[in-house]
Amino acid sequence: MATKWGICSAGKISNDFVVALSTLPAVDHQVVAIAARDLEKAKNFAQNHNIPKAYGSYEELAKDPDIDVIYVGAIHPVHRDVVLMCLQNGKNILCEKPLAMNAAQVQELIATARKFNVFLMEAFWSRFFPVYEEIRALLSQKAIGDVKFIRAEFGVEIYKVPRAVEKELGGGALLDIGCYCVQFVTMVFNGERPESVTAKGFLHETGVDESMSLILQYSGKRQAVLSSTIMATLPNQAAICGTKGIIQIPSDMWSPTSIIVNGKERKFDIPHTTKPMNFSNGTGMSYEAEHVRQCLLKGLKESPIMSLADSEMVASIMDEALQQLGVTYP
């Protein structure tokens, strides 16, 4: 039986997610409905991707009995309300990062998912890439000894994009792209809470963070330094440094196709498509989609790889950082 997907929002990320699904066997994954707040947009999206049903409201999607799981690709300020409504209608959910605007909202969504006994996962697609699987394997084998230091950065010049700077649209570097660095550290340190979070950065004229660096201090004198910006393109690398070696992601740390372990590089292929995509390596979203399918087949209510506890931890670290910079959202 195929996993039947409903798609919430007809934006760029939803396009790439549906294209990524098309690289998987059609006997396993089917998109049965798309919803947008503009029915015409939904109809156009449906036509482009051969989706049978198009809705002009998210509520209709939440109530559709044919759907097994909903992918929420809407902008982050609406995540809480949309996910809440879908969960209350008994729908399993894969929601784009950040899961919500703050840790309190994340906790509310987790509690609701448990109350209605449905699956919920934050779509940190990075964690399901072969490179990330390899990193987890290397860490569990203690291949680089004890981890002492982590560095990660994600910066792209998107300050002219309204979504990246407008407060009402959930703009700012940390929530949009810096979150990938926070989840990276959270994965490496197995969801451990840092002993301290120190944030330094600059605010945009709109009041969101345009550039930010975080220092996270962990027990046992372990440290992580994370940087994110919407003002310039960074090398976008990551490194995990241990007592016996180093693991490096040379580029695109959020969607990597290669890894360097103690100076030796290994490359990994990702699914190929001829269809137009908006984001680099976007077909890699197929990994998280297949993971969700496997979780549902096993009757799981959360992912063992991207746990709800990790989502809560990432949100609480970002809360602390934004508070230190004086960023508040409506």
Swiss-Prot record:
Return the InterPro entries for the record. Gfo/Idh/MocA-like_OxRdtase_N (IPR000683), Gfo/Idh/MocA_domain (IPR050984), GFO_IDH_MocA-like_dom (IPR055170), NAD(P)-bd_dom_sf (IPR036291)
Q: Name one Pfam family in it.
A: GFO_IDH_MocA_C3
Keyword Nucleotide-binding tagged: no
Site (May play an important role for the adaptation of the alcohol substrate into the binding site) location in chain: D176
Highest taxon of the source?
Answer: Eukaryota
Task: List its EC numbers.
Answer: 1.3.1.20, 1.1.1.179
A GO molecular function annotation here is: nucleotide binding
Site positions for May play an important role in catalytic activity: Y180
Assembly and partners are described as: Homodimer.
What family does the entry list?
Belongs to the Gfo/Idh/MocA family.
* Name listed for the protein in its UniProt record: Trans-1,2-dihydrobenzene-1,2-diol dehydrogenase
Which organism is this entry from? Xenopus tropicalis (Western clawed frog)
Instruction: Please name the taxonomic classification of the source.
Output: Eukaryota, Metazoa, Chordata, Craniata, Vertebrata
